[in-house]
Amino acid sequence: MQFGCNVAEAFGLRRSGVVLLTDQSLRSMPLSQQKKVEIILDGMGRGSQAAQGLPSPITSLAFIRDSHHFLFLAVDEDQCLGILKGGIKHLFMLDSQNETHEMDAMCCLDFYTHETVQRRGIGTRLFRAMELHTHISAQGWAFDRPSPKLLAFLSKVYDMHDFKAQPNNFLMLDASIRLWGAEFKQYRRSKKHYIPDAYLLPETRESEYLGEAELTKRTLIRKSTAVIPQTKTTQSEDAPARALTADELLSKRSVVLPTASRTPSLPDQPQSVAAAYMNKRIEGAGPSFEQYMRDHYGAKSLIVPSEIQTSLNHSKDSVSQEDMIQRQRQLDRMAFTLAREANARGSIHNTVGRGVICGRRG
């Protein structure tokens, strides 16, 4: 689709490639550049509306700027070839057993390639760019009102089919519904989001699919991005990848899900102090909570509530780490109490369980 201006130049490209737009990148643009981008996004939004038969456009500059959604665009000099909009949505989904699962899932909210450039790998390149940005395979996404063309694309490229109709018009694989539902139950306890390992993609540089690229070259179609468990029997490299069952996916572990407002990073995190204490055998009454905090955090990073500073003779200088807020201290006190009781009963190793919060595992 042409707009009477150099589309690539409006997004900072020399000729062609894939660009990523977020609310932050739009707000940082000069006003003159925002006007050009607004014309392009409004035009592509109307094209998507007409192609999908929607009553109104669902993609525009205002929608991206005023939300935490993000948008990928494939551009070639003075043309915009396609768009892919994504973001996290709070959903209620039904699995194959008609059980309801609450979740915060990664969603494909709008997908459109211009009619003149379809079947040239543009859609595959856009999907791959979003996968690298979110580190989540498309097999773990939910799709908002997918068109017949999108369903055919998912079946061909990702071997995704047999979706169950949902009241909210989002479609998702049954295994994904169960996995994200289990993740949200754990989120209610730990307040940490997780990506199921079955849909986690490894850390990869995005430069292959973002920025300058030759879009006339056909992108290699990948049949599956799901993680296949290693078996003892060796398989031929040419053999087709077997799709995981729901039970196999549910048996896999999880890693921390980063926020959607920035590019994900999954650094290793140390074991929590509460879990470390629970793994220790305590003889007798054991140390006090204040001594326990000093042993694990150190005197300089120990936060001392104002009501006990005088009685314990702590100086104001000992409060130096801002992120150790009072709420975390209260949670540590609760964990300390439970761990001491468990140690007193002699069953420390049975109490560690799911309470350990860690980074990338596996």
Curated annotation (Swiss-Prot):
<dbReference type="InterPro" id="IPR007965">
    <property type="entry name" value="GNAT_ATAT"/>
</dbReference>
<dbReference type="InterPro" id="IPR038746">
    <property type="entry name" value="Atat"/>
</dbReference>
<dbReference type="GO" id="GO:0070507">
    <property type="term" value="P:regulation of microtubule cytoskeleton organization"/>
</dbReference>
<comment type="similarity">
    <text>Belongs to the acetyltransferase ATAT1 family.</text>
</comment>
<comment type="function">
    <text>Specifically acetylates 'Lys-40' in alpha-tubulin on the lumenal side of microtubules. Promotes microtubule destabilization and accelerates microtubule dynamics; this activity may be independent of acetylation activity. Acetylates alpha-tubulin with a slow enzymatic rate, due to a catalytic site that is not optimized for acetyl transfer. Enters the microtubule through each end and diffuses quickly throughout the lumen of microtubules.</text>
</comment>
<dbReference type="GO" id="GO:0005874">
    <property type="term" value="C:microtubule"/>
</dbReference>
<feature type="binding site">
    <location>
        <begin position="147"/>
        <end position="156"/>
    </location>
    <ligand>
        <name>acetyl-CoA</name>
    </ligand>
</feature>
<feature type="binding site">
    <location>
        <begin position="111"/>
        <end position="124"/>
    </location>
    <ligand>
        <name>acetyl-CoA</name>
    </ligand>
</feature>
<protein>
    <recommendedName>
        <fullName>Alpha-tubulin N-acetyltransferase</fullName>
        <ecNumber>2.3.1.108</ecNumber>
    </recommendedName>
</protein>
<dbReference type="InterPro" id="IPR016181">
    <property type="entry name" value="Acyl_CoA_acyltransferase"/>
</dbReference>
<keyword id="KW-0808">Transferase</keyword>
<dbReference type="Pfam" id="PF05301">
    <property type="entry name" value="Acetyltransf_16"/>
</dbReference>
<feature type="domain" description="N-acetyltransferase">
    <location>
        <begin position="1"/>
        <end position="177"/>
    </location>
</feature>
<dbReference type="GO" id="GO:0019799">
    <property type="term" value="F:tubulin N-acetyltransferase activity"/>
</dbReference>
<feature type="site" description="Crucial for catalytic activity">
    <location>
        <position position="52"/>
    </location>
</feature>
<keyword id="KW-0012">Acyltransferase</keyword>
